[in-house]
From Swiss-Prot:
GO terms for cellular component: membrane; plasma membrane; transporter complex. InterPro entries: PHBA_efflux_AaeB/fusaric-R. NCBIfam families: PRK11427.1. This is Multidrug resistance protein MdtO. The keyword Iron does not apply. GO terms for biological process: response to antibiotic; sulfathiazole transmembrane transport; transmembrane transport. It comes from Escherichia coli (strain K12). Could be involved in resistance to puromycin, acriflavine and tetraphenylarsonium chloride. It comes from the Bacteria. Keywords: Antibiotic resistance, Cell inner membrane, Cell membrane, Membrane, Transmembrane, Transmembrane helix, Transport.
Length: 683
């Protein structure tokens, strides 16, 4: 019996979650981890040498600033410079008019905090306003702790140094000296996806989880944005490279479910698979060299027949369309997104969000001022950091912050008791800190769902052991106060966000599902013919479906944390939503299979068949918001012409009918198990 079998199921699931998160494969993760690790050690060396205070803040700047590629790091560095100017300006404004008057100081700081939190949710550059909000709140602790205005001004001026020198450091490391370019990461990512595709094409492998496929598809889209902004050649041949990304995503996601043992291994099929794998290898070599791939392969009738027999014709045609595309094809002009959210000034949730954050901060400020316990001022920072648009995401951030703070506090306690008494110089300190910072950097560069644990762990550790001390420290009170401050801020935020204007996603989730199914119906209306425009449209919408399904999955996870909802209603909503997501993914792959057979069918028959499916799906999606959707019932008419031309298509479309019938009935009090059907529609 393995050790895992003796552990409770929740513990096993937690360990599996962390294993999945920490072992994430992502181009650029190792360079980002090394840059962050080296940057942390340099910050400690510089701060200790020149006795620069607020070392934890400098480390936080690094963890938020060093990104996965050089362009993104440079962009964030510019934002940090702008944010630093705004932060210090707002602090001096507050101090000038209200240094000795706590009430007036809060009256001035309150609107600044509310404005920053409002803009953080509605503006594209929300990170800047988040940083301003953090400093505006953190700066309120200076006058309360010190009675000397001159010292407070000096500390505030030190904040400029504390914020800007790590920004300069990360620019030197991540942009000038050891840049990790987005274009190189894109080439590596495309080759990795094609390697996985070839493995599934030639061997019978277990399919990867759909969530992983969708996240890697989204990662390619993000890299495409960075490449477009950072590489001139990519901009020149943008249309070809975008088509390449879409094609690779399609091949990778489709072959993930492909099982070569499901088809007869005739000589023609074996030779065709070898030829297809050879063409994919040629595409890999061209991508690795940064060249646009061109193919002279023309499919013969025997190869087309073999491709149709093993359900690879659509993949083959999609690949060849890319190989025959002109690299200098002009790109489609992209619409520039607005800087503000469309409903920024009409949706009251944004202002309520800002008011809730301010209320939580004021409660924490009143508490720690009333009990005269300045060491727990981290509770105010916690209220701003864990403020998220909805209850579920706020709870997620609270768990991450508490978990990171707990790990950081334990490390700080062990470090203070067992290691600090044996240290004599800065070199020994750096050697001891190196593994701690490396662990924090590796966690911080993992998945977005858990990366904040690494940041919080290192910042909490630094606050307790390195903050404003330039020699050995043995004060355990700091560790206690920082941890308690985070716990208090988390509890206050949980109460406020749960009972004061709670923003639940329980109503948004069915609407999100409806939008996703609407995209799927658009896919079904695209003519199933190997025409260039139709294929490109199909691939682009398909990528959008990956993003939509992933967003629905994440929203389900957040709704599961909304404990203010009735437990039975929440469980039923999540069960139905997950069933819709699962069936939607299966419908997408089943519809892919029909493309391989539909080309031989008369064009006049296809719009009627596809329209029948699309209409049923749109009708089902329209009733999700009001919980009036019933499982679609579709019956296909088997015409002699279609049976004579290609009976395989009818079987594939009957499978689509079965998937339609398994969609949950939202009018029923509980989910009923789906039944297997031979011909599709009728239950």
């Amino acid at each position: 019996m393995s050790a895992l079998n003796s552990l409770p199921l929740p513990v096993v699931r937690l360990l599996a979650f962390f294993h999945e998160e920490l072992s994430e494969r992502r181009p650029g993760r190792v360079p980002q981890t090394v840059q962050l690790w080296v940057g942390c050690l340099l910050v400690i060396l510089i701060s200790m040498t020149f006795e620069i205070p607020f070392v934890a803040l400098s480390l936080a700047v690094l963890f938020y600033g060093i990104q996965s590629n050089a362009f993104y790091t440079k962009f964030v560095a510019i934002l940090f410079v702008v944010a630093t100017v705004l932060e210090i300006g707002s602090l001096f404004l507050i101090y000038k008019w209200s240094y000795g008057e706590p009430l007036i100081r809060l009256i001035i700081a309150g609107p600044i905090l509310m404005g920053c939190m409002f803009l953080m949710r509605t503006h594209r550059l929300g990170l800047v306003f988040f940083a301003v909000a953090i400093v505006a709140i953190y700066g309120q602790t200076f006058p309360a702790m010190l009675d000397y205005p001159e010292v407070v001004v000096r500390l505030t001026l030190w904040c400029i140094v504390v914020g800007l020198y790590p920004t300069l450091l990360m620019t030197l490391i991540g942009v000038l000296w050891f840049p990790s370019r987005a274009i190189s990461q894109m080439h590596q990512a495309l080759n990795d996806r094609l390697d996985d595709a070839i493995s599934h094409l030639t061997d019978s492998l277990a399919p990867l989880p759909e969530t992983r496929i969708e996240r890697e598809a989204l990662a390619l889209q993000k890299l495409n944005v960075f490449c477009l902004a950072d590489d001139a050649n990519w901009r020149t041949q943008n249309a070809w490279w975008q088509s390449c990304v879409a094609t690779v995503t399609y091949i990778y996601s489709t072959l993930n479910r492909y099982d070569p043992t499901s088809f007869a291994d005739s000589q023609a099929i074996i030779e065709f698979r070898q030829k297809l794998a050879s063409e994919i290898n040629k595409l890999q070599h061209a991508v690795a060299e940064g060249q646009c791939w061109q193919s002279d392969w023309r499919i013969s009738e025997s190869e087309a027949m073999a491709a149709r027999e093993c359900n690879l014709e659509n993949i083959c045609q999609t690949l060849l369309q890319l190989g025959q595309m002109d690299p200098n094809t002009p790109p489609t002009p992209a619409a520039k997104p607005p800087s503000m959210a469309a409903d920024a000034f009409t949706n009251p949730d944004y202002m309520r969000y800002a008011v809730k954050t301010l209320l939580a901060c004021l409660i924490c400020y009143t508490f720690y001022s009333g009990v005269d316990w300045e060491g727990i001022h981290t509770c105010m920072l916690t209220c701003v950091i864990v403020a998220n648009p909805n209850v579920g995401s706020s709870y997620q951030k609270m768990v991450l912050r508490f978990g990171g703070a707990f790990c950081g506090a334990i490390l700080a306690l062990l470090f203070t008791l067992l290691v600090m008494p044996w240290l004599d110089n800065i070199v020994e300190l750096l050697f001891v800190l190196a593994p701690i910072f490396l662990l924090g950097a590796w966690i911080a560069t993992s998945s977005e769902r858990s990366s904040y644990i690494g940041t919080q762990m290192v910042v909490t550790f630094a606050l307790a052991t390195l903050e404003n001390v330039f020699g050995p420290v043995y004060d355990l009170v700091e560790i206690r106060d920082r941890a308690l401050g985070i716990i208090i801020g988390t509890v206050v935020s949980a109460v406020i966000y749960t009972f004061v204007w709670p923003e639940s996603e329980a109503r948004t989730l069915p609407q999100k599902l409806a939008g996703t199914l609407g995209m799927l119906s658009k896919v079904m209306r695209i003519p199933r013919q190997q025409e260039v425009t139709a294929l490109r449209t199909y691939l682009q919408i398909r990528i959008g479906l990956h993003a939509a399904f992933n967003a629905c999955e994440e929203m389900c996870q957040r709704v599961a944390l909304e404990r203010q909802l009735d437990s039975e209603e929440r469980a039923l909503l999540i069960e139905r939503s997950q069933t819709v997501i699962r069936q939607g993914r299966d419908l997408l792959h089943a519809w892919d299979a029909t493309w391989n057979s539909a080309q031989a069918l008369d064009n006049a028959l296809q719009p009627d068949r596809a329209g029948q499916f699309a209409d049923a799906l749109e009708k089902y999606a329209a009733g999700l918001a009001t919980a009036l959707s019933r499982s679609p019932q579709i019956t296909l008419e088997e015409t002699p012409a279609s049976q004579a031309i290609l009976p395989t298509l009818l079987k594939q479309e009957q499978h689509v009918c079965q998937l339609f019938a398994r969609l949950p009935d939202w009018t029923a009090p509980a989910l009923t198990p789906a039944t297997e059907q031979a011909q599709g529609a009728t239950q």
